[in-house]
């Protein structure tokens, strides 16, 4: 059962951290970023977290309601000039929050780097510091692992709903999917993340396959990497040391 695996997403420090991660793909001034696509990605991510039955802080849902308000006002036909001004003000306030958080995070990272340098000077070895940085990079990539699956689930969600029939749904277990993934990685040591789901048309199978992959990653049987921001995620079977 999916509930048997306890997974905590600790990479995002809050909804603004998630939004900052989403707007960073545009590589432009925050106040010029198109908000509707960002809002859609945020809502897809939240929906995916629900699908995976993962714990979600209330602040994420509060932000989601605010984003849905902005999106709905954007999609409504123009009513009055005041309506437009109010909508633009809501968008500006949100982007200002994200920008303020970005500045705060940059300052926090600078202070953390300074702290690491001081710790290195007094006690830590160079090897220990490199190890810490490696873990940080891996954690950062984990954000995109969930975002990538969110996109896959959203793309297939409508098709899955349309394909519902009276035929009893096939049951999928994490144990079965772990076995299936192990077979795949035995035949093919390296594969693209998206390839794992290309032949899946059932929502339960998609979710169970993803949970099985997380279990393999947690047990250090599979590693994942990403060459560039929002690029293709590559999975690789880790060699078992004798």
From Swiss-Prot:
GO cellular component: cytoplasm
The keyword NADP is annotated on this UniProt entry: no
GO-annotated biological processes: cell division; chromosome segregation; DNA replication
Compartments reported by the entry: Cytoplasm
Coiled-coil regions, chain positions: none
Entry keyword annotation includes Acetylation: no
Gene3D superfamilies: 6.10.250.2410, Structural maintenance of chromosome 1. Chain E (1.10.10.580)
Signal sequence coordinates: none
Listed Pfam families: SMC_ScpA (PF02616)
Keyword annotations: Cell cycle, Cell division, Chromosome partition, Cytoplasm
Family: Belongs to the ScpA family.
Described function: Participates in chromosomal partition during cell division. May act via the formation of a condensin-like complex containing Smc and ScpB that pull DNA away from mid-cell into both cell halves.
Subunit and partners: Component of a cohesin-like complex composed of ScpA, ScpB and the Smc homodimer, in which ScpA and ScpB bind to the head domain of Smc. The presence of the three proteins is required for the association of the complex with DNA.
NCBIfam families xrefs: PRK00104.1-2
Entry protein name: Segregation and condensation protein A
């Amino acid at each position: 059962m999916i509930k048997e695996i306890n997974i905590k997403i600790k990479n995002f420090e809050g909804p603004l951290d998630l939004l900052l991660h989403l707007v960073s793909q545009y590589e432009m001034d925050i106040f010029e970023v198109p908000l509707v696509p960002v809002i859609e990605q945020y809502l897809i991510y939240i929906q995916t977290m629900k699908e995976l039955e993962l714990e979600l802080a209330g602040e994420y849902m509060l932000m989601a309601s605010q984003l849905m308000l902005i999106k709905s006002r954007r999609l409504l036909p123009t009513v009055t000039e005041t309506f437009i001004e109010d909508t633009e003000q809501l968008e500006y306030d949100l982007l200002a929050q994200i920008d303020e958080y970005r500045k705060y995070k940059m300052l926090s990272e600078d202070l953390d780097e300074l702290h690491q340098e001081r710790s290195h000077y007094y006690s830590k070895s160079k090897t220990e510091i490199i190890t810490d940085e490696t873990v940080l990079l891996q954690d950062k990539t984990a954000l995109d692992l969930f975002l990538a699956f969110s996109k896959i689930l959203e793309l297939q969600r409508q098709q899955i709903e349309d394909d519902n029939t009276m035929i009893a749904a096939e049951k999928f277990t994490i144990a079965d999917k772990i076995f299936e993934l192990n077979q795949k990685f035995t035949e093919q040591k390296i594969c693209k993340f998206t390839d794992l789901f290309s032949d899946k048309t059932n929502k339960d199978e998609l979710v169970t396959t993803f949970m099985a992959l997380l279990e393999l990653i947690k047990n250090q049987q599979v590693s994942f990497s990403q060459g560039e921001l929002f690029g293709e995620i590559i999975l690789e079977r880790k060699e078992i040391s004798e």
